[in-house]
Structure formats: C-alpha cells, structure tokens
Amino acid sequence: MDWHSFRIAALLLTSLVVLEVNSEFQIQVRDHNAKNGTIKWHSIRRQKREWIKFAAACREGEDNSKRNPIAKIHSDCAANQPVTYRISGVGIDQPPYGIFIINQKTGEINITSIVDREVTPFFIIYCRALNAQGQDLENPLELRVRVMDINDNPPVFSMTTFLGQIEENSNANTLVMKLNATDADEPNNLNSMIAFKIIRQEPSDSPMFTINRKTGEIRTMNNFLDREQYSQYSLVVRGSDRDGGADGMSAESECSITILDVNDNIPYLEQSSYDITIEENTLHSQLLQIRVIDLDEEFSDNWKAIIFFISGNEGNWFEIEMNERTNVGTLKVVKPLDYEAVKNLQLCIGVRNVAEFHQSIISQYRLTVTLITVTVLNVVKGCVFQPGSKTFIVDSRMEANHTVGEFLATDCETGQATNKFKNVRYRYVMGNNPENLLVVDSGIITLRNRVTMEQYERLNKRYEGTVLSIHDSLQRTCTGTIIMVLCGFWTTTEHPTTSTEKPVTLSITPNVDNVHFGPAGIGLLIMGFLVLGLVPFLLISCDCGGAPGGGAGFEPVPECSDGAIHTWAVEGPQPGGITTICVPQMPPGNANVIEYIDNSGVYTNEYCGREMQDLGGGERTTGFELMDGVKTSAAPEICQEYSGTLRRNSMRECRDGGLNMNFMESYFCQKAYAYADEDEGRPSNDCLLIYDIEGVGSPAGSVGCCSFIEDLDESFLDTLGPKFKKLADISLGKEIDSYPDPDPSWPPQSTEPICPQHMEQLASGHPSISPHFGKTTVISENAYPSGPGVQHPMLIPDPLGYGNITVRESYTTSGTLKPSVHFHDNQQASNVVVTERVVGPISGADLHGMLEIPALRDGTNVIVTERVIAPGSSLPNSLTIPNPRETSNVVVTERVIQPTSGMIGNLSIPP
C-alpha cells in the first residue's frame, strides 16, 4: 500500500472539511457549586479570526475617541458578495444611546462619548452581517466592551455618627463597635479597598481605643476606662480608598462611645464617728442625719446605699431610714431609753450598695465600721399607774360614799407608792367619769351616789373611767383606767313580778359527781360506732331476697334482643302497609276448635297487660287482650254458640327472653299477608323464569316456564291466573262466576262468638258449636321460625275440611335453619290454586339435612306446570319432591326450591 498517496488523500479530505464547515468550535466549561454540590456546563464559543478583531478597553471619564476604531468585524462572505454590517445593544439602540457607531461597509466600531463604569460596567454589542436582501450571512456575534475603572468615588460611611457603649474597667481588646463604609468603584479593586484610621480622640489624655484598618472594628486598648473620670469619648475616624494610599480618596465619620457605670466604688460615710445625746423616755424621729458618699452614677443601684447596724442596737431602740434621692440616712429612736438601765450606748454601723460590687473591686472590699456614741440623759420622772387599769365590782346594795377600792400611782424613781412620800405631794383627780359616779381622794375611790337602774342601763352594765395622778412641782401627770362591773341590779324590790306562778325552791348538793362527759359515756359512744361498723358485714352475709335454703347472689335476667328476637335476613313491608287480616271461620260440625284456631295464627301487635301463672305443671295466661282484632285469652273458655273447647291463644314457645313467640308468629303472618297483597297487583308468574331451550324465546310473553312445551303450543294459556281467565271470559261473553272476596271483613258483627270473661270448670265434654263457618277461606301464611339450637321436628297440623282454598304464597326464609321444619298443606283440598311456592333461605351456606316436599294428599283437579329445584350450593343429603297424589282441580303454577344458606335438619313442604 502506498502510504504517501494515502497521506495526501487524507490531507485533501481534511482541507475540504475545514473549508466547508463553519470555522468555529465550542468549549464547555464545568462550573461546580460547592454549596449544593451541583455541576453546570457553560458553552464558550470561539469565533473565527476573520470575523472579529478584539475590542479595545475603554477608560471611564476619558475621551476614548483617540482609540477608534475600538473594534472591527469582518466576514469571509464579503469576498463573494457585498456585506452590510450592523450593531445593536446598550449604548446603541438602548439607553444610553449613541455611544457606539459602526461603519456598515468596513465593520469598524467607534466610540463617540465618555462612559461611566458605575453606570455601565461593560457593553455587549450584537454584531450582524447581512447580504443585499437583509439576510444574515453569519450567526450573530456578541462583542463585549469592558469599561476600565478609575478612582473617581470616595468612600461613604453608612452613618454620620456611630454610637457605641462599653462598661468601665473592661478588659483590653474588648469590642466596642464596628464601622461600615462602601466605595462605588469596581469591587475587589484597589480603588474600592478602604482603610480605617482614628485621627482624633476626645478627651485626648491617653489613647483608649484602637481600630482595625480593614474591618473597621473599634476595640479597647487597655482596661483603664473609668466612668468616674470620663463618662464619654468622641472619636473621629477616616476611611481612605486605595488601601489608605496617599493618592486615594477619603471620608470621615464621628464615633460617640458612652462608658457604662459599674459598682466599682466602695461607699463611705461622710464622718468617721458621731456623738449624740438623748433624754430618757423620749422618742425622736430625726435624731441624726448620716450622709453616704459614693462616686458611682447617681440614682442607680450602684450609687444607692444601705446603712445597717453591726452592734449596739440589741434592744431595737434605733432604726435608720434611707432617702434614695439624697442617699442620706436618718437615725430614729423607736423605743424609749431608760437612764437607770442604759446610760451610754456605742452603735457600730456599716454601709453598702444595693447592687453587688464589680468583680474588679470585690476582692478589695473591706467593711468599714463607723461608731456612734449615744449618751442618755437622766430625767426626773413623776409617777405611773402599775398596772395601767384596775377592775372593781359594784352591786346594787352599795350605798353612797361606799369605798369601791384603792388605785395608787407608783413613783418612777423609787418604785414606791405615792402615799409613802411625806415631802412630795401627789394629788388625784378624776378624768373621765361617766354618770359622775366616782370620787377619788388620795387614791381612794368611793361612790358618789347609789347606782340607779337608769344609770345601769345607760352604762350597759359596765363603767369605764380614768383617774389622774399629778405632781405639781415637776408638772408630771400619769393616767390610770378604772373599770367597774355592775351586777345584782335585777331584784324583786326594784322590778316586781306579776307572774302568778308559785316559786320554785332549788337545792344544790355540793361534792356530787361530775356532770361532764365521763368514761361511761365515752364507752357507750365507742360501742355505738362499733355496731355501725358491723352493719356492712351483716348486709354482706345476709340472704338478700334469695330462695330459702339457697346461697346469696343475683338472679340473671336474660336480654330480650338475644333471647327471643332473632336476626332475620329477610324483612317484609312495614306493619303500616298491611291490609286487613282475614281470620278463617270456624269449621262446621263439632270439630276441634283448639287445633283449628291454633293453626290459624291470627294475632296483632297490641297487647294490654299480661299475667302468667303455673297451674299444676301447665301454664295459664290471663289478662291477655288484643287492642285490634279478636279478643283472646290463653285459658280454655266456654263459648255460648259453639261446642268444643275454644282456646283463643296459645304460647307454643316460652324462651328465656321477655317476648312471646306468638307475637313473633303474628308478626310474620302479617308480613306474609303483605307479600300476598303485593302479589295481587302484578301478573301471575311474575318471577324469575328458567328456560331449558337455548336460543328459543318464549311465545306470547313470559307467562311461565316453557321448557317442556312444544313450539307454537297454546297450552301455556292454561297456566294463567284466575284474573286472566276472568278477563278471557269477559272478552268471549261468557257468564262470569263471582270469585270469593280475598279479604272479607272478619269477623262479622253477627257471627262473632260471645265468650264469657270468667273461667268455668268443665265437668265433662264441651258444649256443641253450631256450624256457623263458611266454606271459603283464605289462608295467608303458615310460618314457624325456628330458633337456634338442636330441636325436634315440630309438626304443624293442617285445618280439616277446606274447600275452594286459594293459597297465595308460602315463604320459608330464615338466616340459618338448623332444626327440622315441616310445612303441611290443606288436607282433602279441592279446587286448589297454588300460585307460587318458594323455599329459599337467604344466606349462601349449604343445605345440611334432607329437603322434602311431599305431594298433595287427597286432591283433585291438580295441574302441576313446573317444579324447579335449583340449589345455590351442594346438597349433601337427599332432596325429595314427591308427585301429587289424589289431587283434583289443583293448579300449581310454579315451585322454586333454591336454597342459598345452610339448612340443617329436614325441610318438608307438603303440597
């Protein structure tokens, strides 16, 4: 292989690619954000050299026209065709306008005016190359023109005067404040770099502060700040750009620093000692003024002082009250001094501030004791009554000038009574003397007059006056209080009685036993409490209403909701929508009325009281009355018109609950009647139909099951109900036989048997019952719901001797049919029409046990059109549906047995 030829071919191919492809390339630069960890890619495009001539930088504030052209653009397309160059952007067609212009032929860009970097730090010029038609020949080009900064802006402080404060005695290098200044020149440039400097301090004794030239932080230079010497400093700070260079621009600002006060001065008293004198037995509110000197800030807690006693005031004779406005303490005498007890006192006092001392002097503080010498002056005293008051008792027998008692004053110097002194004359006079009752002479108190009843009442049984002892030479006086209790003023002589009662003589035997609460009474009280404590134990141990011989306890009361009312899955219409209930009439002849009426099950929901008694193993119910319908009684009664035993009501089941099961039977009978009445309003066979022939419809409408009817057979018309037959007869003009009223009013007023309201003893047999019952009977439903638990099959006898019976519907629905249920139909029935029978439990369990539907017995004229058994689940046991036997004139339109729940036991539905 010729490698030389291959290299030449490769070079030629590369040249062609370079010529054809646009001569530009992109460089992506990765920008990593350290804060959130993201990476961004920026595209940098390199233009071809022929398209751009790099723009020259422009200096702000100068005439840059001498540098024109500052840039030149050129396109390679100009070699083949004429090219027009145009520019746009800020400074061209956007404000500020007209700064840049371009030569459209040559592509030279010129600057025409002075620029300001603080207004526009750089310009972006968009360049375009256009052909004669105005179309772009090249991609638009961005041309950046940078404006060079000059130092044309001085620093600017954010505040004219900065305010700061600091505590006195602060440590060195403690931060006071921080200054803030800005420069409008280009950031991170020497022109915007500011240096701070303190150029003046007032007072200027010694420099106290220093400033960081870069950050502007002002700090203390030493710990010699003293508010008591200078409370405020003023600084002048200069900020210069270009890092404080001589060619930089500068600005100045003031700083005012306030020195805060601390408790760094120990207070002291104006004098080191005090001497005072005071007379004995005197009180003084301003005995001495003590001034406190403190150099801290006035009216602050550092300045306010507290003067306290160190010693000498053990008797609490003195107090010191401080004046917070003047910081002066006043010494007061609050308790008299006795010269005989204390002649001289040495009071030691100290002083401190309200606030704690500062840490700088707390170690230097020493308690300074100031001495106050108190001299007590002796004063010649007079006399005093000891005690100050005296009580006397005065009764009505005391006459005038009667001596009540003696009340003498005592000399304070000697402590003797005043009547002991011969050369000193004390005299006594009465001060306050109510009713002017007493007279005093040399301390002897006598009655001026006898106390009368009026005085006694005005004084309210008590006299209170004063007596004065006066020393004339010393002019001393003392006062004593005299109290007299007045008693014995209710006598027979002063207040004669008008009572006619005889006087009662009482004798008091001394030295008898004490009448107060003694040990025997306390013992009885304790025994009473013990007996009360035994009562709860006796109540617990006693037989509270239990049966004799049985243990204590409570008899459980069953709940009605679970005892008698079951949870039924099928709910019929409300009782308000039930039509009139038809009660079947009595059968002819001397039939067993008990079985007949017991099987009818006609009840209502309203009762008027109930009483049940046990009668020799049986059950008797009295007072059982229906508000609507036939009045019944559960005991055998004797009817006047019919023979046999008539039992109007019977209780087949009495469960533990409080609801009679006969009421439940009546309730479901009414529900069944409601279903039958509802069925009258819709066509016969209006139910779910099952077709066995796939793809063939039902001719003449869905009137029944056509599984065994041939095509185009009209025998299905025979299965129509009586209403349709009657309609057909009317259409053909035949004679219409009236049908019995399905809802006759029952019972007739004339045929209702009158039963006695009292019970009679039946000797033998029963009175005969006249055949007063009709042949036409409508039975709505025979429903016997079974309760939970295993029970024996319950046979429900059918009424005998029916004729022309129409059975509307028979439903047996229950949540779970555990026991066996047996349904009996009419015996020896003729002309029977059964419209529908459905045996279908609600739930979806299996049918356990045997489902049996016996055939009709002794029936004639019976036509069975369809019997369908469609269980919803598996039938583990046998399912038997026998054929009708001995039937006559009976039309059974449909029977559907479709269980969907578990049925445990035997389900027997006779035809």
Curated annotation (Swiss-Prot):
CDD domains: Cadherin_repeat
Pfam families, per the entry: CADH_Y-type_LIR, Cadherin
InterPro entries: Cadherin-domain_protein, Cadherin-like_dom, Cadherin-like_sf, Cadherin_CS, Cadherin_Y-type_LIR, Catenin-bd_sf, Desmosomal_cadherin
Membrane topology, as annotated: Single-pass type I membrane protein
GO CC aspect terms: cytoplasm; desmosome; nucleus; plasma membrane
Cytoplasmic topological segments: 541-911
GO molecular function: calcium ion binding
Topological domain ranges for the Extracellular compartment: 50-519
Subcellular location: Cell membrane; Cell junction, Desmosome; Cytoplasm; Nucleus
All residue ranges annotated as the Cadherin domain in the record: 50-157, 158-269, 270-389
Glycosylation sites per record: 110, 180, 401
Residue ranges annotated as propeptide in the record: 24-49
Swiss-Prot/TrEMBL Desmoglein repeat repeat ranges: 783-809, 810-839, 840-869, 870-897, 898-911
Regions that span the bilayer: 520-540
Keyword entries, A-Z: Calcium, Cell adhesion, Cell junction, Cell membrane, Cleavage on pair of basic residues, Cytoplasm, Glycoprotein, Membrane, Metal-binding, Nucleus, Repeat, Signal, Transmembrane, Transmembrane helix
Domain remark text: Three calcium ions are usually bound at the interface of each cadherin domain and rigidify the connections, imparting a strong curvature to the full-length ectodomain.
Function, as annotated: Component of intercellular desmosome junctions. Involved in the interaction of plaque proteins and intermediate filaments mediating cell-cell adhesion.
Quaternary assembly: Interacts with DSC3; there is evidence to suggest that the interaction promotes cell-cell adhesion of keratinocytes.
Official protein name in the record: Desmoglein-1-gamma
Organism (species): Mus musculus (Mouse)
Source species taxonomy: Eukaryota, Metazoa, Chordata, Craniata, Vertebrata
